[in-house]
Every structure is written in structure tokens, then in C-alpha cells.
Amino acid sequence: RQDDGHIYWVNAFQNSYGENRSTTHNDEAFWIQVKVLEWGGYPKIETLDQYYDLLERYADANPTTEDGAKVIPYTMLCEDWRYFCIENAPQFLDGYPNDGSVIVDTDTMKIVDYNTTPTAKMYFNKLNEEYNKGYIDPEFATQTYDEYIAKLSTGAVLGMCDQWWDFAYTVNDVFKQTGLDLKGCNYVPLGLTAKEGMDNMWHTYADTLNNSSGLAITKSCEDVDAAFQFVNDILEQDIHDLRFWGVEGEDYLVDDDGLYYR
């Protein structure tokens, strides 16, 4: 604990150098199946209303899957700490990145609880509307995480809001094993906003500050400076390359544009 009464910790999740070239959105988004986009002619979807309109129209035209299972236009997960699948959406709809529990307005340097905004009211009203029309999974409030993953894995769920890492490792593997990936069941992320034409920061190339956890140095640490230096060093590019790529010239090559390849 410092003299000001606070305990500080280090956000050591990642450090980006240069241009991020990742192609996977390993974060939160509204997701939709490829086959739904294809059916709709790959429309431009900017808003929540446009998103649900496409889900509704597809479900009305295709009420069952190829094997006869009932299509679930939209489901939500709210078991335990995973309630973020429902609760986080207003900050994205207002055009902000995932800054944790609040919206940070960098112009006014004010923070706002995104559950108290007009956009949040619009969002939850929309969920109620879709639920009452029968387009939201009636089991969403009671289903467990395992039940949620099982539903997604059948290919019957057209859309949801979730973190990629929360479902993709399991669901994508099942799709590959069952051939559902070839039938357009894979999920595509969408950066929705409350209104058309708004700027959005839903995809931040994994550079979103995570202020909910981190590394702290205990008071029994004999060399605090060395401990922090170690944390700093393991985030260096050389360590990243060695861990994920290997030895340059032996395990991978780098082209003239700085792109790594094997």
C-alpha cells in the first residue's frame, strides 16, 4: 500500500509494436452466422435494429435447420460472471471500446456507467421487444454455460453477443468436426452502434486496457525494481518472437515489409 492509501498493479497483458496484423477478433461483439449474411445478400449492418431485422427475416424464412432442429434467432448468456454477454453491449453501441465497467469520454475526461445511458435504455427495450416477439431464446436466463455452448455447437443459433474466446475454441472445433463450418454456421463479428454513421471502437486489435486485474508486487519482495524490470522485459518483441515464432532464419522468415512467415 502506498502513502496515498492505494494499492497499484501492473496491466501486463500485452504490448503492441508497429501495425497489428491479427485477423481474429478475439474480443466482444455481436456475432452472426455466415449463412445468414449470405441469405440476406451480405447487407451493410450498422445498427441494432438492422441486426435484429435480418435475424427475424432469416428465422421466418428458415424456421428449422437442415436436420429439423428449431432455429434460435438470438440467445444470451448470463450465468455467473459471464453476464457481461448481456451487460456490456451499451458501451459498444455508443461507439466506445471495452474499457471495463464504464465509458471513458476522453474529450471531457469523465467516466459514465454505461448501464445508465439513453443507449442502455434503448438496448434493453429492444431485448424486451425481441423476446416478446419470440426471437430471443426463452431459456437464456436459466441456461448454464455448458448448455449455451451446446446450443451454439448445433448450428441452430443465428446470433449472440459474446467474447470470441468465450465460445470459439469449443464451438469452432465442433463445426469443423461436424462439417457445419462448410454450411455457413461460423460466426462473424459486427461492430454495431446505436445509430447509423457513428464512429465505433469495438475492434481495438487487443489493445484495450484491462484495469480489472494485473500483477502486484508484495511488500516482502526484496528487489522491487528487478521484479518490475522482469515484467517489462518479458513484454519485449524479442521474447514474443521467441515464444510464438522461434528463431529467425531457422523457424521463420521476415519479408521486406516486416511480415513474419514460415
Which role fits each region the language model picked out?
Residues 1-262:
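Extracytoplasmic/secretory soluble proteins
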